[in-house]
Amino acid sequence: MFSCPILRKEKILQELEAERLRRQNLIKEDLQKKYAELQRTGFPLSECIGFIADLGGSNEIAYHYELICEDWERDDPLHFDNSFDKHDLAGIDFLFAAINKASTEKILVFTAYLIAEILVRSKHRDFHTAACNRLVPILVSLTNTKDCVLRRKALIAVGWVGAVQEIGIFNERMLHDEDSLCRAWSASGLWQLSCNRLHSQTILPEVKDVFRQAIAAEKDLFACGVMIESAQSLFGKKWISSIAVENEDAAKIEKARKSAVRFLTKDEI
């Protein structure tokens, strides 16, 4: 009575293994031919999904990265980077080497960001801590870029891979960065630290007064909302909803601001 389900399972496993081997055996010329066909047909979504999987399953790491760099320049990217994590540690090592050869600041920031994206999905891997520690100094230096769009990406990535030493960077940016989204992502970066490499109890004493100052002074409604939402996640409170922040609901944000500042002003929390 169990033979049919067992046979189906075995058949599925065999097909999956055959597909894995097919992708592993793809060479650059195979991928180039497929890419040319995608270009000719206008990059249909269903075909792109299969091609992205082929890129990640192949051993052609350099060609995959070449297409990713081209994709980053598109107004409507195809997200070829979505499967780069399948290259595993070899892919991460390749990206670190690529950072040293980056032709533009944008490529440099986007490459470092891609490494961080992969690492945040690889917390269970043996290489995670060492790779994070290797990446953090690079990202920290990139938070000083004058390009606010690139600075935002660097700050987001620091939140994924940073440690206790990076708390001060977020505190400083949340209070003083000239770009409202950089201030917002600095606040959410502190919360991201607690979701990834740090326990919230390590963060709270270092950020309580900074959150109070930043929330009280913030003029941009969205940034203020993100700060409040980040603080409430860290301190276990509920002052505002994500929808109110996204909608920049002035009345709800101002009400939440008062509650947050009142709470953060307390001597003991």
At which residue positions do the language-model features occur?
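HEAT-repeat alpha-solenoid elements in large eukaryotic scaffold proteins
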Residues: 64-75, 107-119, 144, 184-190
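Alpha-helix N-cap/helix-start positions at coil->helix boundaries
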Residues: 73-74, 104-106, 148-149, 179-181, ...
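Internal alpha-helical scaffold/solenoid segments in large eukaryotic proteins
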Residues: 148-175, 185
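Amphipathic alpha-helical scaffolding segments comprising HEAT/armadillo-like alpha-solenoid repeats
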Residues: 28-32, 46-67, 86-100, 121-142, ...
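Structural signature of alpha-helical solenoid repeat scaffolds
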Residues: 116-120, 159, 191-192, 228, ...
